[in-house]
Amino acid sequence: MVPFAGWEMPVQFSGLIQEHKAVRERLGMFDISHMGVLRLEGPDPKTALQQLVPSDLHRIGPGEASYTVLLNESGGIRDDLIVYDCGSIDAERGAVVVVINAACADSDTAWIRERMEPAGLTVTDLKNGGVLLALQGPEAIPLLEQLSGEDLSGLPRFGHRMVSISGLREPVFTARTGYTGEDGAELLLRAEDGQTLWTHLLDRGVTPCGLGARDTLRLEAAMHLYGQDMDSGTNPFEAGLGWLVHLEMPADFVGRPALEQTAASGPAKRLVGLKLQGRAIARHDYPVLHDGIRVGTVTSGTWSPTLEEAIALAYVPPALARPGKDLSVEIRGKAQPATVVRRPFYKRP
């Protein structure tokens, strides 16, 4: 167990490699109850929330979700999050659910409340008495269909619905989302139902997975970790998340002027994928070199159990961000050859 954002979290259960391969080949489950979950209710909650994110939330409808980011005034990323459109409550009110990172949960919640409550929205912390579980892997959806008796094949990526699972007291908020690069679902449910479901899944032989496998899986899929691969000093264009910025929409949002300027001038750095020669692993903050001169910094790195190669994410100048570019990473005082590659490193065939 290790401390993480005020929680005690398991690094591994049976072993990182075994857990990683279980998710890639079959199915693994994660307790992700450390994540923050907020429900916003009131008149037109998507329009109100739009002022905080650069992605056009009106592109999604009830039962759909959008990955996006919260920004500061300089266009830096406060956090990344998923916004779930939960549709209408009645003729005058709608609801959205947002899932935020554990390390940012307190500051995000205060910041969102400060801006949403004056707009007439009620902000409720759903973590009180609730848990989040993630089922990830090619067998995740078939297993949920067995447990619920429902056909989930039509639930699209980033789709969500309430699902009644056998043995649980209440229907479960079920979203086809995840942080592994595999198919799967994330479930929001009551604490007592969470314990029941976790125990039942263990009895069925589902592999429990810890933070170690969660990190190697997300890194193979080139999914960002907030605080490492992006932070308040990084804008979406630098982080390879420019596709989240919809400057064509008329709505104003925090950080828009700064992002308009960056879109016109180009980013000062770019996040790239690196594959390293040999077995040496690049870690956070290791220097990236070009012709022996430091030009960038590694943000995340690991040994890929799937590819059996050392991989990393790093920021480098735009001129050096082209796939195929030869660079090196300084590891324990020695320059290890590395090549810029396209992200993600792994994508399910």
List the predicted regions and their residue ranges.
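Short secondary-structure transition/capping motifs
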Residues: V37-E41, R59, N72, V83, ...
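Acidic, proline/glycine-enriched N-terminal capping motif
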Residues: M1-T68, G76, G212
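Conserved, structured C-terminal
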Residues: M1-P3, E8-V11, I17, C86-P349
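Short, charge-rich binding segments
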Residues: H58-P62, L70-G76, I82-E92, E114-R115, ...
